[in-house]
Every structure is written in structure tokens, then in C-alpha cells.
A protein has these predicted regions:
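Conserved cytochrome P450 K-helix/beta-meander segment immediately N-terminal to the heme-binding cysteine loop
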Residues: 35-59
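Cytochrome P450 heme-binding "Cys pocket" and the immediately downstream C-terminal segment
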Residues: 77-105
Length: 120
């Protein structure tokens, strides 16, 4: 689910050494931006990347970062919170369905939902 709709839209990083990525030269000290939505729907990594499939395995998404020193410290807590939230929500409202337009947050950093009408 986090691969399909990442809560963080992008992160900016500083290039540590001169490098070339897909023919594009990038010099040390330059800033680059990684867009999570693009990385999490990369056709080279995910078969049918625009298909919502919670059984996808393996699922090497980068919703919590790509590893190393920038990996999200709270990712394990976030996964537990999501599991508990969905278990409780679905046990109380098993037939919950969308009932109107989703209103997204207006943010250049966080990709959240402001409101989402549902019916059950």
C-alpha cells in the first residue's frame, strides 16, 4: 500500500562525488531530488507498477527510504500502526467503500489525505 501511495513525495540529497546516472553527469555538491512516486512505480522494478496489489512479493518499495543512513527510523512503528489500524477498521466496518471525492493535502512534501468520505 505504501508503494502505491507514498506518504512522503520527495527528498533532496547532496551528491557526494562526481557520478553519471543514465548518461547524465552529476557533480559533487549538486543537489538532486528523488520522487518516491516515480521510484515506487519504476517499470524496471515492478511488474504492472500502476496496479494496486497488496500481495506483491517481493515489494522493494522505497516509501521509508532506500536504506543506509537515511532509512526511516520509525518504519517498524509505522508498519505496526498501519496493521493495527486496518485490522480494527475492517473488523468494525467490513464493507467500507469510498463515497465521494478524496481531498488531498496541499503540500510539496507530504502526500496525505485531508478528507475521504466513506460509506458502510
Amino acid at each position: 500500500m505504501l508503494r502505491f501511495s507514498s506518504p512522503v513525495s520527495h527528498f533532496k540529497r547532496t551528491v557526494m562525488e562526481d557520478t553519471i546516472i543514465r548518461g547524465q553527469a552529476i557533480k559533487a555538491g549538486e543537489r538532486v531530488v528523488m520522487f518516491y512516486g516515480s521510484a515506487n512505480r519504476d517499470e524496471d522494478v515492478f511488474e504492472n507498477p500502476d496496479t494496486f496489489d497488496i500481495t506483491r512479493d517481493p515489494n522493494p518499495h522505497v516509501a521509508f527510504g532506500a536504506g543506509g543512513p537515511h532509512l526511516c527510523l520509525g518504519m517498524h512503528v509505522a508498519r505496526v500502526e498501519l496493521a493495527v489500524m486496518f485490522k480494527e477498521l475492517l473488523s468494525r466496518m467490513p464493507l467500507v467503500q469510498p463515497d465521494g471525492a478524496i481531498e488531498r493535502m496541499h503540500s510539496s512534501f507530504i502526500a496525505g489525505i485531508h478528507s475521504m468520505p466513506v460509506k458502510y
